[in-house]
Curated annotation (Swiss-Prot):
Induction record: By stress.
Family listed: Belongs to the chaperonin (HSP60) family.
Gene, per the UniProt record: groEL1
UniProt name for this protein: Chaperonin GroEL 1
Compartments (UniProt record): Cytoplasm
Record function comment: Together with its co-chaperonin GroES, plays an essential role in assisting protein folding. The GroEL-GroES system forms a nano-cage that allows encapsulation of the non-native substrate proteins and provides a physical environment optimized to promote and accelerate protein folding.
Reactions accelerated catalytically: ATP + H2O + a folded polypeptide = ADP + phosphate + an unfolded polypeptide
Length: 544
């Protein structure tokens, strides 16, 4: 085991503070509409230009191991806020630094760190309750666009695209962000259930120009095993042919004699049919097939459930208004399943998302929920250069997450105004605390609440303390619009923050800052000294 370098008490706290301050200084310059960009060197490719707090934080590693511990803890604040709310990482970093710096001053002056932490936690609870009271639910398309615009650094084009996407796919729908091949940023919406499996033979296509197979008023056969022979498959095919309706077959695979029979019937008899492989793998495949069955009002033909392909009847098949199958994917539009069954399935998936501990599983469950309930929107981000595209893509990601957070918990006056509006409530609460150090802890939070507003003002070239006083003297929804350098009604001006983002930023910042304040020792490996001399050449020093 490597030898350790241990720092105690004042030395430890100074090192942590230096690390926290170093990271916060790099991150907080990005805050607000007049925040600056940060350029990050990459080991390969061109440098990355960003205004996203968590992207800046993730790139920072300090040489001094003890200082790096402080920086990594604040990086955790940004990451946790990004994971929970998807935005607000810079606000969280500013709050964490403000709480820790003020707390450290009091610990150095002799305050009990444990009592300070208790006071901080109690104050945060009071502020969160007040934030929830101030919060307003999102009701209009316009408000969604405003939240997205603010989060995308006042880019109205991005704001409107995200609002349009949200309107089309609903709050359970999925919005994905991809890089476009051109200069334009565009929105594509896929209605209905879409999965990335195309037709098994190009002979199934009905449109030679688009190479797509379009089936109107289609029946859907859903089977969880391979179909290779024709014997078991023939009875259901005959029933469908007699009904005169087109057929989509979804199975683990369709090969050999079965596939050849379908192709021949398609070409010679004009039987409108298309075969695709089932989406997903393993247990996820079975779940997705069940989703398709519920969406189309059919049954999953599974031998595990005691069903056989040869006994399948028309009543067991799903139905859809339209099916579009291309070389790469399949879209089922307006499945005719029962609304109650679909809602029940959606609730079941939501419960699984809540219970899941794996980010990957949550993402896949969210995809399934989107496909069942709303649809999928894809925002393709275009720009003149790759650097600009990546920076823009970061802003679209932020705006998308902020919008989802706003729909979930509501909106607040933006620009740091909501936190400042909680100051009078917290001031009234502090005298109720009986422990003097707990009161000091609550006052630390009281002072930190104005830090984001002061930083936004500082980035706009103004004196933060004066701006803060002006905001406090005005009515509840009025705040400072840094972009236009004016005091205005933030709700009317469309300068909004999602409640969830503000709440998560404060909770994450207070949690980590409280832990750092109660730290008394730091343990780090002593770096091994590297030998400066070059290794000896083979055979050196030998006399031949």
């Amino acid at each position: 085991m490597a030898a350790k370098n241990i720092k105690y008490n004042e030395d430890a706290r100074k090192k942590i503070h230096k690390g926290v301050k170093t990271l916060a200084e790099a991150v907080k310059v990005t805050l607000g509409p007049k925040g600056r960009h940060v350029v990050i060197d990459k080991s390969f490719g061109s440098p990355q230009v960003t205004k996203d707090g968590v992207t800046v934080a993730k790139e920072i590693e300090l040489e001094d191991k003890h200082e790096n511990m402080g920086a990594q803890m604040v990086k955790e604040v940004a990451s946790k806020t990004a994971d929970k709310a998807g935005d607000g990482t810079t606000t969280a970093t500013v709050l964490a630094e403000a709480i820790y710096s003020e707390g450290l001053r009091n610990v150095t002056a002799g305050a009990n760190p444990m009592d300070l932490k208790r006071g901080i936690d109690k104050a945060v609870k009071v502020v969160v309750d007040e934030i929830k009271k101030i919060s307003k639910p999102v009701q209009h398309h316009k408000e969604i666009a405003q939240v997205a615009t603010i989060s995308a650094n006042n880019d109205a084009e991005i704001g409107n695209l995200i609002a349009e996407a949200m309107e089309k796919v609903g709050k359970n729908g999925s919005i994905t962000v991809e890089e476009a091949k051109g200069f334009e940023t565009v929105l594509d919406v896929v209605e209905g259930m879409n999965f990335n499996r195309g037709y098994l033979s190009s002979y199934f296509s009905t449109n030679p120009e688009t190479q797509e197979c379009v089936l109107e008023e289609a029946l859907v056969l859903i089977y969880d095993k391979k179909i290779s022979g024709i014997k078991d498959f023939l009875p259901v095919l005959q029933q469908v042919a007699e009904s005169g309706r087109p057929l989509l077959i979804i199975a683990e695979d369709i090969e050999g004699e079965a596939l050849a029979t379908l192709v021949v019937n398609r070409l010679r008899a004009g039987f409108r049919v298309c075969a695709v492989k089932a989406p997903g793998f393993g247990d996820r495949r079975k779940a997705m097939l069940e989703d398709i069955a519920i969406l189309t009002g059919g049954q999953l033909i599974s031998e595990e459930l005691g069903m056989k392909l040869e006994n399948t009847t028309l009543a067991m098949l799903g139905k859809a208004k339209k099916v579009i199958v291309s070389k790469e994917d399949t879209t089922i539009v307006e499945g005719l399943g029962s609304k109650e069954d679909i809602e029940s399935r959606c609730e079941s998936i939501k419960k699984q998302i809540e219970d899941s501990t794996s980010d990957y599983d949550k993402e896949k469950l969210q995809e399934r929920l989107a496909k069942l309930s709303g649809g999928v929107a894809v925002i393709r981000v275009g720009a003149a250069t790759e650097i600009e595209m990546k920076e823009k893509k970061d802003r679209v990601d932020d705006a998308q997450h902020a919008t989802l957070a706003a729909v979930e918990e509501g909106i607040l006056p933006g620009g740091g105004t909501a936190l400042v509006r909680c100051i009078p409530t917290l001031e009234a609460f502090i005298p109720i605390l009986t422990n003097e150090d707990e009161q000091i802890g609550a006052r630390i939070v009281l002072k930190a609440l104005s830090a984001p507003l002061k930083q936004i003002a500082a980035n706009a070239g103004k004196e933060g303390a004066i701006i803060c006083q002006q905001v406090l003297s005005r009515s509840s929804s009025e705040g400072y619009d840094a972009l236009r350098d004016a005091y205005t009604d933030m709700i009317e001006a469309g300068i909004l923050d999602p409640t969830k983002v503000t709440r998560c930023a404060l909770e994450s910042a207070a949690s980590v800052a409280g832990l750092l304040l109660t730290t008394e020792a730091l343990i780090a490996d002593i770096p091994e000294e590297k030998s400066s001399s070059a290794p000896a050449m083979p055979g050196a020093g030998m006399d031949y």
